[in-house]
Design a protein with these regions (language model features):
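Active-site-lining helix/loop region of Rossmann-like oxidoreductase modules
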Residues: 8-12, 109-224, 228
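C-terminal active-site/capping subdomain that shapes the small-molecule cofactor and substrate pocket
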Residues: 190, 197, 201-304
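A structured beta-alpha segment of the ubiquitous adenosine-cofactor-binding alpha/beta core
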Residues: 9-45
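Receiver (REC) domain switch-region micro-motif
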Residues: 33, 58, 203
């Protein structure tokens, strides 16, 4: 509402911005930290652990801890059970309440939930090309004018993340650490396109148990997880929508589906080389970043891993 927006602006107006390195000082004023900082990977690893050691839970958008064996990397609809690894992480850090949880890269949100919905058909080979918005680089057209009318066929580090991070989401806990899944094999190309918000993916899939198109669509529209079951505030009611029109999903039409927390899928059809192909779209700064982190925090609160009282 307008009244609540005014209240929020007033609340922010009186906040004092502090230096991230003043760990004890900052931690004394908060009971939760969202981390999205522009530092080196080693610096991020250390600062996030420093905050956790003050008994402050950390949910991170950074990539630094995504492969730390006892740090859960979670999309709450896909692998909330990975939060259980927090107990062994706390032992390592020597904490009772403090820990780090991370969310995966924005590039995989357009296809990882889709492949999860189809897991009973055993996808084993995936080719994905992502078309990624400039906000993923923290830019707008005003400060990146050379992106107007342009495409850049390379985004540093993005292809490795897009190929490997889904396997960690689908992994399992063994001896207090997360062991990644071995399949499916995923190969990607990640391309920067002149779009402000919204990552699109063109994806080809082979299945061990080839389903019908109708079965695939049914799995998509009925896909839900713990956030939907718990009716968490940021959770989309229907995580994945399927669009029948040949010209959808489109960024302009569909990127804000479910307030940017849902995934839009279209153009599902049989393929001559692979079994099926489709196009997926997600909001890279909402589901893919800030919103995904908030949903992680809400899920952690709901499953009693934190001492928080979230609104």
């Amino acid at each position: 509402s307008a009244a609540s927006d005014v209240y929020k602006r007033q609340a922010v107006k009186s906040m004092i911005v502090k230096n991230v390195n003043e760990v004890e000082e900052v931690a004394s004023h908060v009971d939760f930290v969202f981390s999205a900082v522009d530092m080196s990977k080693d610096e991020i690893k250390k600062i996030e652990e420093d905050y956790a050691k003050t008994e402050t839970p950390v949910v991170s958008n950074n990539s630094a801890h995504r492969w730390t064996p006892d740090v859960p990397m979670v999309v709450p609809e896909i692998n909330p059970e990975h939060f259980e690894v927090i107990e062994s992480q706390k032992k390592r850090l020597g904490t009772t309440k403090g820990f780090i949880a991370v969310k995966p890269n924005c590039s995989i949100q357009s296809y990882a939930p889709v492949l999860t919905a189809w897991k009973e058909f055993e996808p084993y080979e995936v080719v994905a090309t992502t078309y990624q918005a400039i906000s993923g680089a923290g830019k707008t057209f005003k400060d990146w004018p050379e992106m107007e009318g342009n495409i850049i066929p390379y985004i540093g580090g993005e292809e490795e993340k897009s190929e490997q991070e889904p396997l960690r989401l689908w992994g399992h806990i063994e001896d207090g650490v997360i062991v990644k899944a071995e399949t499916p094999v995923i190969t990607t190309q990640c391309i920067r396109v002149p779009v402000l918000n919204g990552h699109t993916a063109a994806v080809f899939v082979k299945f061990k148990k080839k389903p019908t198109k109708e079965q695939l669509i049914e799995k998509l529209v009925n896909f839900s997880g713990l956030p939907q079951e718990l009716e968490l505030p940021s959770a989309p009611k229907q995580m994945i929508q399927y669009l029948e029109e040949d010209n959808r999903p489109q960024v302009r039409e569909d990127v804000d589906y479910e307030n940017g927390m849902g995934i839009s899928v279209g153009r599902l059809r049989e393929d001559t080389v692979y079994d099926y192909k489709f196009v997926g779209l997600s909001h890279n700064t909402v589901r893919g970043a800030a919103g995904g982190a908030v949903l992680c925090a809400e899920t952690l609160k709901a499953v009693s891993y934190t001492h928080l009282t979230l609104p």
